[in-house]
From Swiss-Prot:
BP GO annotations: maturation of SSU-rRNA from tricistronic rRNA transcript (SSU-rRNA, 5.8S rRNA, LSU-rRNA); ribosomal small subunit export from nucleus
Location of the region described as Disordered in the Swiss-Prot/TrEMBL record: 1-58, 105-125
Organism in which the protein naturally occurs: Vanderwaltozyma polyspora (strain ATCC 22028 / DSM 70294 / BCRC 21397 / CBS 2163 / NBRC 10782 / NRRL Y-8283 / UCD 57-17)
Record protein name field: Ribosome biogenesis protein SLX9
Subcellular location: Nucleus, Nucleolus
Keywords linked to the UniProt accession: Nucleus, Ribosome biogenesis, rRNA processing
Phylogenetic placement of the source organism: Eukaryota, Fungi, Dikarya, Ascomycota, Saccharomycotina
Family annotation (InterPro entries): Slx9-like
Molecular function terms from GO: G-quadruplex DNA binding
Amino acid sequence: MVAKKRNTLRSKAAAGRNAKTSVLEDSVLNELPPDPKAFLHQHRESKRDKQNTKQQSFLSQIKNKSLGLDSNLAGISKSAARRRKRKIRDDLKPKMGELLTSLEKEEDLKEYTQDQDDSKDADGDEQMEISINNVTKITKSNKYGKLSHELPGSVKIKKNQPSIRNQKGAKQLAIDESKRFNQVLTNQSFQQNPFGSLREIIKMQK
């Protein structure tokens, strides 16, 4: 005699109940509105991450500067970049020709104003005319007479001079320049006619 299966009906009933509950749960989830707090806890950058990004950007900038990488020099060869940098350095140097032209313009303007004053004060005091002529008179200085044997345009290169590129040389050059500046200020020819003295020195150096 075969035994009867007593759990078949129970299993069928349990399966039906489970199916109904799953359908109900799905329907409830679909009917619920979206959670308003779902996007409140987004990922935020911490202070350590910000510090790391700043440090990396700073290190990359230093690396680019040390390698000579510039956005304006991107895509050109190293020799062309060196030529451009050399040209920029040369443009920053003082141009003695421009100073000479400015001094000549100053002298022309002074002579023009003098001519006008002389025409207006032709019947004036003669002592005033003598003082004006003495102011505009160019007196040659004998201080730089030793440079007369050199050809114009020749530059005398002094060896074993302190270099401006290191700290010790720059300090020594500053001391020498201050001494030379004081000597120039105390020079009698420079005190009598400063523009004329500057013009003579520039013409000697050209």
